[in-house]
């Protein structure tokens, strides 16, 4: 069974259906609460640009259509991310994902990356592509982060609740930075071109804010 959401222009697949029935005009597909067979993905049209799995999906992603630009693998996915299409710009790795990200495994086209709730792997130098501009680190993440492991392309960086490492010498390209209530350390040596920072209210006297930077207290 499937239905078409005209507002989001997305085909939502709730039960098995033949992919020959999917119009080539469809560019956005969402699998809702099912575990599609691996060969289903091979049959997906190269016209599809947006692919979402809401839950239950936990299969390799090495044979997705080369046209995919946006991929949300859902909350159950916990597989290697090697072999993603070179066209991909947005990747959401959901709640269960906690796999090492190897150097060169993410496509060089990627600009937006969300690492989900359980991700807590070291970010090694070269593991994030030089195209990346937006990075959100999930709730559990508590690994050291430094200028050497983040590409100079990053402009937006968000830390999760458990993160509690020093953040000195972040890339100078960062313009937007967010911390949560869980951060217990002093915040210093911020990028000079920072435009906006979100910090806990108890940190307002413990940080040196660059000139003209907007501060949002939470």
Predicted regions and their residues:
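Concave beta-strand-loop units of leucine-rich repeat
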Residues: 11-18, 29-39, 50-59, 70-79, ...
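Short, T/G/N/S-enriched strand-turn elements that build extracellular solenoid repeat scaffolds
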Residues: 1-5, 16-24, 37-45, 58-65, ...
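Intrinsic low-complexity, intrinsically disordered segments enriched in polar/basic residues
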Residues: 89, 93-96, 105-118, 127-137, ...
